[in-house]
């Protein structure tokens, strides 16, 4: 177990272990010459072949400096006039988040451009050309050749270019192009804002890609940083050349970019992080000399932090009142039930969100407002049971014309047993728990969208097969190599399913 911290005071004096190379600025000035005045050849194509009332969804692609075709998701709210735009960068080694997740920004009139990093989990492919091992990740992909051929140098140049792409888009306010991300995404937002001094705001959460020597010394050289351990074991087992490697990696250390940021910054540190060391997160924060505000999250590791998400839209739009439509911790009269509520005047549809694992907040729920739904989210309580869900559903049926229930784990099981009501239009269920005789207890016959998970320890292949056989009115997707987690594909299927109801 890595060290867990209780406050920023314990890490505030953290310093970098490697100095910025003397020729760092010269190196990057040379790299930027490769991307100046190139033909971006920007292309847009409709992403989903159906109409959404409040947002347009596109796949965008452009040519990078070496002929690589870089792919992005582009979302634009259907509003008049120019909009601000967020450059949203994803974590390692994933892909841009689902359209549904990104659409939370568009509910408040913000466009989004989300790049897929080359050679990772999205649509952008890596053309190769780097010299070095590739077995354990991008940190060592190119480490044995010229540093300018390292894959992260190429990704950083793509990051520079995606800002240039954003400036070319119609109806975007060029003065309000901002950047955001967590982990690798935070690192790329730092790089983007450092190379484009005109960027005025960035939001960062537990940045990756920094102080590789300290990461190694603290034994965080696994998971995201596993390439460091692999390289040491197989190419330098006695460690005699490690300092040379760390000196080389300093050219892609985001702490060396952080001092070049002019933007206003909000910065989140996860004090129990087991992937991106809190000490390293703190040392990156110290390098930022522009206007900055720190948020620390005690007890949080490398995970979704909803409280940080809720700071994004008010920060970018400079209006702290923008979450005033979110009503947390509301007690439902006579039911002894507490809920979080996000609602919009005039909505006659409601989405009831039931998740025993995590308490989502306003940023997450804004995507449902886009589709015309108010949201009620049950605050988790170990004493809640099937009767709790049934009573809450009956309460909402008295307030709204249409109800959709989105439920996970045991709440998904409970939902199948809810008393049927014609106002319940659909169920969206993920992570059902195997339960004996559940199919004899099902009361509800509305439309159902269900995801089953191939490596979920709480269910079996036989149970998943019975779901397909026994449930009617079912749209069903099976994800054989997923456990209980967020699935981009299923998120966008939720969006389309809700839009068609």
Predicted regions, residues:
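Gly/Ser-rich "nucleophile elbow"/oxyanion-hole loop immediately N-terminal to the catalytic nucleophile
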Residues: 138-182, 386-404, 409
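Short beta-strand element of the alpha/beta-hydrolase
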Residues: 72-76, 82-93, 347-356
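N-terminal targeting or regulatory segments adjacent to alpha/beta-hydrolase or S9 domains
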Residues: 1-55, 321-326, 371, 399, ...
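Hydrolase active-site cap/lid region
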Residues: 191-238, 413, 417-447, 452
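Cap/lid segment of the alpha/beta-hydrolase catalytic domain
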Residues: 97, 102-106, 110-157, 356-362, ...
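N-terminal cap/lid segment of alpha/beta-hydrolase-fold proteins
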Residues: 35-80, 321-346
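C-terminal catalytic histidine-bearing segment of alpha/beta-hydrolase fold enzymes
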Residues: 275, 282-327, 471-501
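Short beta-strand/loop motif that positions the catalytic acidic residue
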Residues: 261, 267-269, 273, 444, ...
């Amino acid at each position: 177990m890595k060290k867990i911290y209780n406050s920023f005071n314990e890490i505030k004096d953290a310093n970098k272990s490697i100095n910025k190379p003397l020729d760092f600025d010269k190196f990057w000035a040379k790299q930027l010459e490769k991307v100046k005045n190139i033909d971006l050849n920007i292309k847009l194509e409709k992403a989903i072949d159906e109409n959404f009332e409040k947002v347009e969804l596109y796949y965008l692609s452009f040519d990078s400096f070496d002929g690589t075709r870089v792919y992005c998701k582009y979302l634009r709210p259907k509003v008049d006039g120019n909009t601000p735009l967020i450059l949203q960068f994803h974590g390692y080694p994933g892909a841009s988040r689902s359209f549904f997740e990104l659409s939370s920004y568009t509910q408040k009139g913000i466009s989004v451009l989300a790049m897929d990093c080359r050679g990772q989990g999205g649509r952008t492919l890596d053309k190769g050309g780097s010299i070095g091992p590739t077995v354990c990740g991008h940190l060592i992909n190119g480490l044995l050749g010229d540093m300018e051929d390292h894959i992260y140098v190429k990704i950083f140049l793509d990051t520079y270019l995606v800002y240039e792409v954003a400036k070319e888009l119609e109806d975007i306010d060029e003065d309000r192009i901002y950047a955001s991300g967590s982990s690798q995404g935070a690192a790329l937002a730092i790089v983007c804002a450092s190379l484009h001094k005109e960027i005025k705001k960035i939001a960062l959460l537990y940045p990756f890609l920094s102080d590789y020597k300290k990461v190694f010394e603290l034994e965080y050289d696994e998971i995201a940083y596993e390439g460091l351990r692999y390289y040491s074991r197989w190419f330098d087992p006695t460690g005699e050349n490690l300092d040379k490697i760390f000196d080389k990696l300093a050219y892609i250390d985001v702490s060396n970019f952080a001092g070049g940021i002019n933007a206003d910054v909000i910065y989140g540190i996860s004090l129990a992080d087991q992937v991106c060391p809190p000490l390293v997160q703190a040392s990156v924060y110290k390098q930022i000399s522009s206007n900055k505000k720190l948020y620390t999250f005690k007890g949080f590791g490398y995970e979704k932090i909803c409280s940080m998400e809720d700071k994004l839209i008010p920060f970018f739009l400079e209006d702290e009142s923008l979450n005033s439509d979110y009503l947390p911790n509301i007690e439902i009269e006579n039911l002894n039930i507490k809920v979080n509520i996000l609602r919009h005047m005039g909505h006659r549809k409601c989405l009831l969100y039931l998740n025993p694992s995590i308490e989502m907040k306003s940023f997450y729920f804004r995507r449902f407002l886009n589709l015309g739904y108010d949201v009620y989210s049950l605050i988790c309580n170990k004493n809640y049971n099937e009767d709790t869900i049934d009573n809450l559903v009956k309460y909402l049926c008295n307030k709204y014309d249409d109800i959709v229930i989105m439920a996970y784990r045991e709440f998904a099981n409970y939902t199948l047993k809810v008393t049927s009501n014609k106002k319940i239009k659909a169920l969206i269920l993920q992570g059902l728990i195997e339960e004996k005789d559940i199919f004899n207890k099902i009361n509800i016959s509305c439309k159902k969208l269900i995801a089953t998970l191939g490596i979920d320890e709480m269910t079996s292949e036989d149970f998943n097969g019975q779901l397909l056989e026994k449930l009617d009115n079912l749209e069903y997707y099976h994800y054989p190599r997923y456990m209980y987690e967020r699935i981009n594909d299923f998120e966008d299927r939720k969006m389309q399913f809700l839009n068609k109801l």
